[in-house]
Amino acid sequence: MRTPALAFALMLATPLSGGAYTVITDEHVDLQIEYVGGSLRGKIRADNEGNVARDTGLLYDGPVGTTSIARPASSTWNFLGVSAGQPIYYWSANNVPGHIFLGFGSDGGTIPGGTFASYYESDARVDETAPWNKITLTAMRYTAAPGESGAANFSLWQVDTFGDVVKWMATADGITSTDATWLVESGHAHYNWGFTKRGHYELDFKFSGYLAGSNTYI
């Protein structure tokens, strides 16, 4: 199921106005997947605010709380969408005090164990059998902050136990079906979230999986 409009405001002077947003900053947050009425849908779950509707939650990182680094020179990082040495703004896969700690989750009873069937996922980034819930990026919209111009890019990645970069999603080469990650049923995982420019981002995700028993793909 398509889950629209997960919103991010990155390094704006003030949070965006003109909408009924619940502004979330400086805490642990998950985009939570839940199984309701035969379909998958998403919501925001924040440690302080609790459950927040996905289209009213704004994850905000202002000038004080924003992490940025210079893009490394290695071609490994080309997927970020900026040249070597240029800044990339990101939220870490590790819990860094003062910054948003964002992940995906289907734990806490939102997807009871046994809801989804195990299957072998052949994507080389996974290559395992489990009751997978697939998370696919389907669209991104960007509104520039004052002083910014041009296109912006988003990326999602992890670093594995061998120190290798695992790219899950990147808009710099276009959005395709390969812009996806997988979460084990009732699981929880954190990622590095990268943004190339200051401004307001909206990301659309589709959640899918095979139901246990019928193997129906939803």
Protein language model annotation of sequence segments:
Residues 189, 197-201:
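Short tyrosine-centred short linear motifs in exposed loops/low-complexity segments
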Residues 21-187, 216-218:
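Phosphate/adenylate-binding glycine loop and adjacent helical scaffold
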Residues 1-6:
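Bacterial N-terminal signal peptides that target proteins for export
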Residues 210-214:
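Short, solvent-exposed loop/turn segments at the edges of extracellular beta-sandwich modules
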Residues 9-11:
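Cleavable N-terminal signal peptides of Sec/SRP-targeted secreted and luminal proteins
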Residues 13-15:
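N-terminal signal peptide c-region/cleavage motif recognized by signal peptidases
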